[in-house]
From Swiss-Prot:
Stated role: Catalytic subunit of the poly(A)-nuclease (PAN) deadenylation complex, one of two cytoplasmic mRNA deadenylases involved in mRNA turnover. PAN specifically shortens poly(A) tails of RNA and the activity is stimulated by poly(A)-binding protein pabp-1. PAN deadenylation is followed by rapid degradation of the shortened mRNA tails by the CCR4-NOT complex. Deadenylated mRNAs are then degraded by two alternative mechanisms, namely exosome-mediated 3'-5' exonucleolytic degradation, or deadenylation-dependent mRNA decaping and subsequent 5'-3' exonucleolytic degradation by rgb-30/xrn1.
EC number: 3.1.13.4
Protein name: PAN2-PAN3 deadenylation complex catalytic subunit pan2
Origin species: Neurospora crassa (strain ATCC 24698 / 74-OR23-1A / CBS 708.71 / DSM 1257 / FGSC 987)
Keyword match Glycoprotein: no
Positions that bind Zn(2+) 1: 525, 530, 535, 538
Binding locations of Zn(2+) 2: 645, 648, 700, 703
GO molecular function: metal ion binding; nucleic acid binding; poly(A)-specific ribonuclease activity
Gene3D superfamilies: Cysteine proteinases (3.90.70.10), Ribonuclease H-like superfamily/Ribonuclease H (3.30.420.10), YVTN repeat-like/Quinoprotein amine dehydrogenase (2.130.10.10)
Activity regulation info: Positively regulated by the regulatory subunit par-2/pan3.
Pfam family, one: RNase_T
Organism taxonomic ancestry: Eukaryota, Fungi, Dikarya, Ascomycota, Pezizomycotina
Reaction(s) catalysed (UniProt annotation): Exonucleolytic cleavage of poly(A) to 5'-AMP
Tagged with keyword Nuclease: yes
Amino acid sequence: MDSRDWTQLGCVAYPSPIHPDYHAGPASTIAFDNQDELLWIGTQKGFAGSFIGRELKRFTAFRIHPETDGPLRQFLFVDKGVIFLGSRSVYMAARSGVPIWSIRHESMQDLRAMSFTSKGTSEILVAGWQNKMLVIDVNKGEVVKELPTQDQYSFLKMSRYICAATNKGTVNILDPITFTIKKQWQAHGAFINDLDTSNDFIVTCGGSHRQTHNTPAILDPYVKVFDLKNMSAMNPVPFAPLAAHVRMHPRMLTTAIVVNQAGQIHVTDLLNPSNSQVCYTQPQGVVLHFDVSRTGEGKALADNKHNTYVWGSPNKIQFTEIGIPPRLPDPPQPSLLPPDPDMLEELPLSRIGLPYYREQLFSALPPDIISDVGAPPQQIDPNILSTLTKTDWGYIGPNKTGLQRNQYMDTRSTMKTSNTIRAPKFLSEKARESQTGSEDNTLATNETAMMTPNNDHWSLRPEAPPEYRICEIKYSKFGVDDFDFGFFNNTPYPGLENNITNSYANSLLQVMHYTPLLRNMALQHAATACLADPCLLCELGYVFDMLQKGEGPSCHATNMLRALNHTSNASVSGVLEDIAKDKNPSTLVKNLTMFLFDKISQDYKGTPPISTELERTLFKLNQPPNPLDLVKRLLETDARYQIKCMHCQHVSPRTATTFVNKLCYPAAKPNIRGMKAQRITFSQVLKAGLENEAVNKGYCTKCQRYQNLDQRKIIFNIPAVLALCTEITTAEHRKLWSTPGWLPEEIGIIVDQGHVYCYEGDDLKLHLNRGIHNITVYSLVGTVVNVETKSPQKSHLVATVNVGRAEPESKDQDRWHLFNDFSVRGISKVEALTFNAAWKMPVVVMFQVKAANHRFNMDWKTRLDTSVLFRDNNPHALKTYELLDRETEIPGPDTVIAIDTEFIRLKEREIHIDEDGKSKTIRPISHAIARASVVRGQGSREGVAFIDDYIHIKETIVDYLTEWSGITPTDLDPINSQRNLVSPKTAYKKLWVLVNLGCKFLGHGLSQDFRVINIQVPRNQVIDTSIIFMKPPSQRKISLAFLAWYLLKEDIQQNTHDSIEDAQTALKLYRKYEEFMANGSFHDVLEALYKKGKTLNFKPPRISTGAAKDAGFGAVHRVGTPPVPAPGTTEGSFEISNSSTATTGGSALSATGGMGSASASSSMPSTPVRKPIGLGGPFTVAGVVKPSPATSLDNFGAGAVGTGITTAAATMGGGYGGYGTDGAYWGGPNDMAPTSMIGGSAFIPAKFPPGPPETRGFIPYRPQVLLAEREAAAAAAAAAAAAAANNDVGGRGGVACGNGGAGGEQGKQE
């Protein structure tokens, strides 16, 4: 970070001299926006203003609160807007100034600071110089909690904890969940003037009294530093000019920026304070406020003279990562009428009279008159442009349009009529009609015609037929899943959906997929341990694997196309349709072909493939080849340019390795009367393109001047995959391609002494029969075709592919298909190879060596690299999972795993509104996976998660969907997240490996999960509980929450969704299903389930509702996934035994102590799950417990099973060690813990330990017990208390309870 080139880039006076707050004082606070290129400034009387970019151009200004409330204190930024803090109110508004909510509360007396909490941007904590703190729900705009406090706070900043600066110079560390003080430091003697935090550090500036408290405090000549990780103070950083303000650099984690009141800026490394840089600013007054932008490139200072300055490097500065300025309002349109002095602004329009009239007004147009004002101008046909001659004033040429001079065309008539295939009915509509028997067969004829082979050559028609035109996806209220893709494809070859950005690549992906060498290359690489992100070769392998496994009519390449956005040089290569200068589909796909072949060759060289058996056999190699040599043989045209000066005959060589070759057409020769025009063949054009001989102007090093240079390419090797760009630019080129049979199915190439010879047709057969030369035969795999349509319809790309090349050897090798995105149908060879100069021209042609047809190497499936499943990508993250054991837990075809995912929203849906006001969805809402959890489905650790990945999203996130996903911005922040944050590639690779190992995926509503993950799982590997518990005639799928409530008596998804919990619940439902099938009661249970669901509208009643109480249900729920215990410890493990023990042989529950998690011997997960409580049955009394006199509270709860007693009134188990839930218990000999049991499944304590359970470092349970049960248990406890009075009952180890439980029996014996 170099501060030497910093300079003042902008300055603004706010409040300005004309502002009503000018005389009240200078700015009260400043802050950089974290999303838009804005700097916000607050005033002393409650105004806020925002300014754009380095020039500080005025954007918005509006009042936040009345001037009697005093100055504006602080800004906080969220996706939807800005939160403003005043002394007596909290206000939220959009960045444009539109208010969202405002809160005034009786407890708001003198607020000074606010901060986000553990729930991310959905909740804030506000505090000040008052005795109460308040928690505010940002989404609802209401106070949800009031917290008393003994300290008065001036600053709040969120990092690992909430760091709070008091008005007495101390720094308090607050728990972000309970808001209790965990640590306190005395930072400065009198006051703290500024505070900031990073992930691990706190830095403060402040002042102290130099002699006595009666003397005024002055600023300290140092910056105090505290280590949050180790909870310790570090050596202060000296700052002789007296530190007034400090900020941590947002990108350089150990760098702080310190400013004094005169504007002197020091950039200091906290770990090496002697290494610092200094920058001198020239403020007009004393610096009152300072802030640094999110990128660290912009610095803002505000002085007491109403000026705010922006400093930074003039060559590189932007406030946010993206750097997009906010959208400005449209400027007002000037009035077309001259100003009228009589038209006063206060004059109502009703005072202006209208003349009397008897004839019809001119504005009353009859309905048959059409006004086409504003219609878009007609696009000029490219075919016409190619025939025009350029002049000094424009272009001139023959009029072939059939229209007269200056005659225009009704451009809207073509918009109203669409020559496309009529869209089918939605699947939901068909289902309703089939149930009612009113199915409409009007589309049956269309569908039959669509799928019945037609011998008519569509390519000979003057315009593109419907089969070649753009196919649009229609959306119902059920989204894209309701669209009938099967209507457009009844072949076994999946299409690709086109509702994704950059989906123009679909046609090229289909051609590459059916090129066996490219498919094998991608899959062999994807099966390696490659975790590079992005890696386009891996992404191609995943797409090809989806298309191979595809059992439906369509797939989508979302992940591949997203990875394209993040690949280096993609934006400058013209392959991203949103930002490409030339958006013509043919140009885009040509650029993409060259870009992809270059990138996948680099990726292939980086990691050796799993197997090279196919390549060794094909190229007759003895040893495993080097990846560099393989790339040359597979993709590279090995050549060298020979550049010869036409003047001095000097020859200079230059390497000319290419992956994609361009065809070169001979110059048109004038027709000579009486001579037959020479026929130009494809082989001649190919030879000219490979050798690329041309004469160009260039610099000759020998002549030392520009001369005509003869450039010729000497070829040494032609690759096995020959990708060609057609480079069709003139009408002559179109005429060539329109010649029937001009593109051959096979070509032969001979490379001899740097020369290339190409043959086709009879010439090829002749050379093959003679067998003199070493000729390589190439087969045509497919073409990418540009379908040109007249304006306003858009041109687009389709693919014609011979899928027979990529299938096992068969008699019928010519199996041509037309891939029009998700519309796929078989076509004849003649149709595939016929082109039309008017609308059908090829852009990319793909050949492959004939010897590689029908050849596959499936070794990658048996040699799949599985190391990603056993690698911990983030050892320091919060552990909510346990990795698989390499020795005992090897996934395979018999492995059942339960999966659930959580999503975030990347883009809102795009809507197109027609001129008649009708709207339709162009692109649906775009989601991305943010969390993926996979739990074991069998074995001794059934229900224990072994994958719990949070995904680092690189795109801009529109909505975290926290209410439904449980995902907060902090979870996905690579700097502040404590989660197991991984790249999208790593998370996807784990699931892809499990699919290809044959594991069975169990979950609820998996189709949506798989769609967002963008993975194809074969049907025989999917177990979907939403389908298992679906009554076929109803076609209604029941929610996971309702199934859990009804079948498992558990109330899940109380506060948010937790993917581990949902996966565990789906697993338990499947076990229930197996149980019902075993005893033959499944159909009866299903009937009762739907009957109960209809009465409750298939929504589970929550515990607080009367319906839940009437049903007799109780539940324990949690608010997140607690961490699993460290390996080798027994902390927090629960063991449930179903064997009969002790006197009456009931079920028993024992706890082996600890704090937090549970494991079960009978298929219960070690991650704590909600357990039913209050279901009736016999009552027992848990053992009386007390800690050992030598045991402190901190280490209480880690011993062996304690002692207990039993009486006729109740069974009393051993002591309960620690408190692993907030229902955990410790106490004296006379304390009783009543518990309601059913089958030994749960327990309830009678009292809680002092202090909130969150201070013990775990996520609490919230047990609820019916009042009647508590009273009954208390009565039983009283009877047992007398017998237990003289017994030292309890201990540190655990509790055992149940009818005749083991702990009670042990207590009896002792």
